[in-house]
From Swiss-Prot:
UniProt keyword terms in alphabetical order: ATP-binding, Host-virus interaction, Hydrolase, Methyltransferase, Modulation of host ubiquitin pathway by viral deubiquitinase, Modulation of host ubiquitin pathway by virus, Multifunctional enzyme, Nucleotide-binding, Nucleotidyltransferase, Protease, RNA-directed RNA polymerase, Thiol protease, Transferase, Viral RNA replication
Disordered as annotated region, ranges: 619-760
InterPro entries per the UniProt record, alphabetical: (+)RNA_virus_helicase_core_dom (IPR027351), Alphavirus-like_MT_dom (IPR002588), DNA/RNA_pol_sf (IPR043502), P-loop_NTPase (IPR027417), Peptidase_C21 (IPR008043), RNA-dep_RNA_pol_alsuvir (IPR001788), RNA-dir_pol_PSvirus (IPR007094), Salyut_dom (IPR043629)
Protein name: Non-structural replication polyprotein
Composition-biased stretches (Low complexity): 636-651, 668-693
Amino acid sequence: MAFQLALDALASTSHKDPSLHPVLESVHDSLTDSLQTYPWMVPQDLQPFLLKSGIPINSFGSSPHPHPAHKTLETHLLFTHWMHLCTQPSSVLFMKPQKFMKLQRKNKFFQHLHNYRLTPTDSVRFPSTSPHLPNTPFVFMHDALMYYQPEQILHLFHQVPQLTNLFCSLVTPPESHFTHLSLMPDLYTFTLKGQTLHYTPEGHSAGSYNQPITALSWLKINSILSPNLNLSITILESWGPLHSILIQRGLPLPDPKLLVRSLPPFSRSPDPETDLVSFQVPKSVELPQATFLSQPLRHRLVPESVYNALFTYTRAVRTLRVSDPAGFVRTQSNKPEHKWVTPSAWDNLQTFALLNCPLRPNVVYHVLLNPLQKMKLYFSQHWRRLGVIAAPGLFCLSLLLRSQKWSLPLPKAKSISVFRRNLLLPPKPHRPPLLPHPEQMLQEFKLPWHRPPPKGKRNPFLTLLINLLHIPREICAGIRRYPSYYQSIQPKPLNPIQQFRNQLLAQLHTLPLPKKFLSILPRARKDIPLLPRMSFTTVNLPLQPPMWLAIGASLVPELAFLLSWLSGDVDLQTQHDIYHHHLHPENFTLSWTRTPYLALAPSPFLPYAHSPLPPLPVNSSPLFPPPPPLPPSQPPLSQGPATQAPSAQPTPGEPLLAPPTTELKPESSNPNNPNPSSSAGSNPPPKSSSSDNPPAPNKPTPTSSSTTPPSPNLPLQFGSIHSPFLSDGQLNYSALPPPQDPTNTTLSLLPEPKPPTEVQSPLMADPTCVGPAVSFSSLYPRDFFPNTASFLTRLRLSPPTPLPMPKNNCLLTAVAPSLHINPHRLWTSLQEVLPDSLLSNSEIDSVGMSTDLLTALSHLFNFQAVVHSERGDILFGLQSAKTVIHIYHTNGPPAHYSPPPKIIGSNSPPSSQQHPLEQAALRFKYQGSHLPFSSFHSFTTSVQHAKNLISNMKNGFDGVMSTIEPSIRHQPGHSPREKFIALDAMIDLARPKTVSMFHLAGFAGCGKTKPLQSLLSTRPFHSFRVSTPTTELRNEWKKDMNLPASQAFRFCTWESSLLKQTKILVIDEIYKLPRGYLDLCILADPCLELVIILGDPLQGEYHSTSPHSSNHQLQSETTRLLPFIDHYCWWTYRVPSHIADLFSVPSFNRSEGHYQMAVRTADSYTPGHFNLVNSVATANAVIQLGFPATTISASQGVTHHNRVTILLDKHSRLLSPSNTLVALTRSTVGVEFLGDIGSLSGTNNSSDMFSRAIYRQPINLSSSFPRIFHLLPLLNKPISRRSTRLIGSHSPIFHNPRLTNIHLPPHIPTSYSQDFVVSNPIFQGQADPRLDTHFLPPTRLPLQSELLPAQLSQTTKPTDSFTNNTPFTPVYPGENFENLAAFFLPAHDPELKEVTRRDQTSAQFPWFDRPFSLSCQPSSLIAAKHSPSQDPTLLPFSIPKRLRFRKSDNPHVLSAIDVLLGNQLFFNLCKAYRRNPTHVGPFNPALFAECIALNDYAQLSSKTQATLVANHSRSDPDWRHTAVKIFAKSQHKVNDASIFGNWKACQTLALMHDFVILSLGPVKKYQRIFDALDRPPHLYTHCGKSPADLSAWCQTHLTGQIKLTNDYTAFDQSQHGESVILEALKMKRLSIPSHLIQLHVHLKTNVATQFGPLTCMRLTGEPGTYDDNSDYNLAVIHSQFDMKDIPVMVSGDDSLIDRQPPLAQSWEATKRLLHLRFKTEKTTHPLFCGYYTGSAGAIRNPLALFSKLMIAIDDEAIHDRRLSYLTEFSTGHQLGDALWTLLPESTQIYQSACFDYFCRHSPPHEKALLSSFELPDSVISKISSSTKWLSKNAFYALPSKIRKAVIASRHSSSFPENPDVSQLEFELLQSFQF
């Protein structure tokens, strides 16, 4: 890091190159070696992977290769990795000889090459085959291990005893362990098909190959175990899909920790270490599974950085909408480093983020709690865990109370005595029965399992057990029967005195004494006192509940916590753990544990053995028992095509136990075992294939039936060996296959597939009918109307069943009155011919009866029915029937049949409104298909459309007939012009007319014309005429119809057709005709009844060649005729399938050969090919050269049967999608492009559709025609049959998909907030000061920082311009505004000022239909008006003057002159600010964060919410940040330069990506703060200043000397690379982060627009446009002059110097390097930013203000603009009489006229602005409420109170530069201490 800082310090000095010389010397050898070893052109996105893998590649490779990264990996493996491993004599297997020779030259130990031809491709790869196996200790197998099984490798080690190490390269994707989608799609892709893995390197399909899917098992095993030999497997290296594996003889020694028992416990491991391997995958996290759903792991892997960023984002925004996570994901999904993520994973990620965004960790951080509060908080958080821990203790405590003799002591009166008498005697002692000893109880019960303990000892366990158990009292009573126990119970012994006393009293009581005497004798108790006495004793309340109560009480805690766990909330600790586990998943790692592989017996390494294997010992037994046989239903695995061994492959999965190599056969088929019973009784080890007579390789054995083909899943095997050598052309050792064993039944063990169960339809399962299902007309052949009796039925067998009458029986009730038959009789009759399944089903129950039943009724009762439906009259029944009934059908919903209304008098039933030709057109078929329309439509003409067209035709603006043949004399009224004049007069009196019409629409070449021509050839349509837009199309109609010469008048062009009359009019290519032509044709022909129009709305519209035509102002025919399109034919007969496939259109013209046969480029014109060009002039030039040609537009509708040539020129890039579609679809063979191949580059400056066609990329018509394509009702195949079946609410064939299938997104208002998911609350403080962002597009919101301001606003309020001085007003000479305005505008022709280029005229001086009242012309003609909506030529004509383009798409390279000049300008800019150019200030992160918040505020407040929503594309992640959209600025700029001026180029605005604005905008605001801090007082910049500030500065600093002003010509375009250097140096001076500086330089040197790449010019719209222009201007001024302290004013390209300074000495040298054009002027009345300035102050230019007033008055907008103009006027008015010293004499009358107008027309509250007194609140309220529009200068000129009131009165600011932002910048400058 220190060296890098030192080099950066030397960047601008001459010492840097010598300092870097050692660095260059150190990398020279490495770079040279890398270029020689890896010379291939590795893609840029794969280089980081290779470098991370330790491969020293370079980015200077020049050799192309179809898969360079794989070639680099292989080269590194062979010449770096293997080169160091080969330390002994080695052999190499499966390598081309040339590659081996190169390897041998690098390392002499590579001695032998052995190749074996195992597959057909090996004969090409290997010119010869080795006759023996390798015999060296080291063997290197090149890219073949994936085709081998462990048994085969074991066989190789058996055959070659010298072999110790086998080094193998394995190519297999490790992620195939769990998915079929690559994790490195740029490096490789693969697919899984059955048991085969198809591997494609780097998208190179020709280099793809197949390999067994079980090849992955080599990465999952660590050893191969067999009875005689064990092999160990080690993964040495892994480079993505390439792995280096070492297979060694023997196993490694066991871990010493398992063997040495004397090791300390911490060093001794009881189990072996886990053999875990991991592989390189992108950094990702695994999303959790959805609840109770299974989602594949591959679709749950998302990038770690995206997940963490999205997690933070969803919790950082204040309001999260439903679309915000998806918008954030969209900003990341298109990044190249995320190609491996699947669309399902992105979907799961945004869904997961959306659904889990409300979750927050339920934690608290209470650090100031006392111990009691901490205990309380701990218990509240962990009470459930504490309860669960205490529950077992409570359970044991309940049982302990039962077992232990615990009691509760209570006080009780023992005795009460008085006068030596007991009033309350103590209770007699009662001895509870004692329990026997446990041992004694067991002895008395004499249990068989009890053994008495030795004498003197007791069983402690049994004693404790019985003491814990409570023995009920009943059991105790039974135990008393044992005398041995009760004899052991002795009473408590008494002392001798008590014994003597008791004996004496007992003797006295036995004497014959009187009772009274005996009553006074003391008994055997204590003496009773004389005085009253009460004694107490303690009574123990036993705590011994019953058993059931004790057990129930013990279970209460457990049940309570179980219920709490099931139904209660999760405890906080568990919530915390689940939250972090669920929302912060660990990084995904692709790893697994390797396990041993058991191989019971080896299988041949090759399909032929060179030497027999040594026999195994007889007493040898396998290490593991043999596995059970495979189930017979499991098919063998398929093998790979290259170097694949023939042995059977194991079951896919983990390699645990290998299957035996011998084939399983029945015992009777074994020729070596004649005694099946004897062999069945023994269990010998499996026999190895290495015997003296090796068996033939395994082959699929057929079954006993010779007709059964072999299974296609069985592996292909080779024959046995007949010769040890192969000839050069031979593939392998092949021979005739051995005879097959006819008794082998291996394949017969496979289960036979069961035939699928046939599900019968209700009709076939109906028991009331018999026979096959046939149509009703076949079963009952009669003359039914077409397509009415084609429904399926069967022959009725049983008599009518009493089916109930359905509730939807309106068909029967509609037919019954006309037939005079009861509906129930009709219902019964239907049951005689139709099965019950057709009469009782869900259709009849839900939607009603169909016309199928009406056909059946017509057969039964011999009638025909006319059904009057909404789509016309439809006939049902018998054509020959005499009885005709009428019924009516309405679609509803619900659909309904009804009888005809009653006939009154002799009136017939009401006639149908159907056109008489409609039925004929609907029934007509051409080659078995109907015309693609549903019904006739009623079209009502628009007289306004017709009048507009005929007026333009009469004047010659549209069409040519009115202007041709001027010299020919016609009879009066018969010339074309006179006829059009007469037609125009007729249209003036015409009324709207309605005719029938149908529209045939479809893709180009779909066959609209041929079927219609056949229809017109029929008799009903013979009276027709055809109108075409071109003569070429008219000639095609003539040729195809082939009518007699007398009928040629029926084919005419569109103008001559207006002068003819027929009943039927056919208009071909309607959309190529002028708007209103259809209306004019109908109104001009009184005989017209039917109109048939053909056209494709996708193939473009009519465009008038006259700039004076107003036809384009009418509504487009594509949208006007859209409701009449019933079907859009989505197929083509003309376009070749190669081209049709680009549009996803089915084509009947199948292409032959390669795609280039249909679409290709050419170097010259091809004879016989028709040429399509862009313009008429080009077509005439090509025709003059002898080649047939026409314009692309004129070729619409024409079919060419040869290839057409499309001429490309610079206009091809501007072709519309409609024209390019026409060009690509004209030929039945194909197209070829000739000319400007740059139009096919696929960039912004090319034709998109042509580019996609030449590169065979799909063309999305939805994006090419976004306004109309989604509205077209696509018909995917021709209509072969029209359904006349009516049922339900609609007819299925005429269902309009436009109404249901297409759903346009609804308009969402900006205030819509119902899609909020999370709305985070505001903690503490007041309302959030940030602006709302919920209306921003989802892709814009992640770019918004939403930082809160860190510094509080404590600055004082800005002072107004009011003063307390004595008010004074200037003296005006007096001038009437209206009188001066009447003669201000000179009489002139505004069209002379317009510019005409390429037959297009500008419209900057519109005058037609413009109001005017002040003078003889509209006042808007004073200056050019720029209106892009009204002037389509504005931007194209202005581009040459406003933009400067690069010659190529390569980035602009900064030259040495740019660096030199940029540094010179930077030094002079620092001199202007009095700065040290070498000083670099520290970066202030806090201030920069404030600037980010301020920039966000400015972006949200400077435009309305509707504007931000409308500009949602600016945050589109698919929009490259270097791409800029250029558009014209709409303005009516009125100043001294534009008044009475000519055409002027507009100002271009650059629309940049939001990323650029939000990233670099804070940088410019950060710089602006430091510039304001450093700016000396004599420097003035107008940014953020009001006119009052300008006037005050002028009064302070300007003098009365002659001023020097300058305004540059094309200032923005004149700034080249030096401006980029200047801006980068300005940012480096403030230590702006380097990535932002690099971003700025990258943008300036890589800007691309829709018109082409731009140079390093200034773009209006880039961040900091004004500041950078002002700094550039100021740097140029200080480079030109020696300014010192001369006052200077700068504002963009405008500047003013107080007096003439001396020139700088270096100016002449600097001037030659600049590209600026100066417009310097010396004057005493300088004009700066529209204000005349001087020592007296500043005043608004009265000439411009007067002109603006005139324009506003004539535009009737003065009421809205008057306050703005008055505010600008007040700045100079308040100067008093001093203002006259600032104005030139020629402008003083306009100042007086403006004052006259304001005095007479402004209301009093507005005129208060002219006063110098402070405005009262009432006036401020009136001004703010009446303000609708304010200019920027006017807004700044308002007092601060009014500005705040105006802002508060508006819901959202719409000022181009919010003045609050300048105020906040000023506050930041005051708040931060520098």
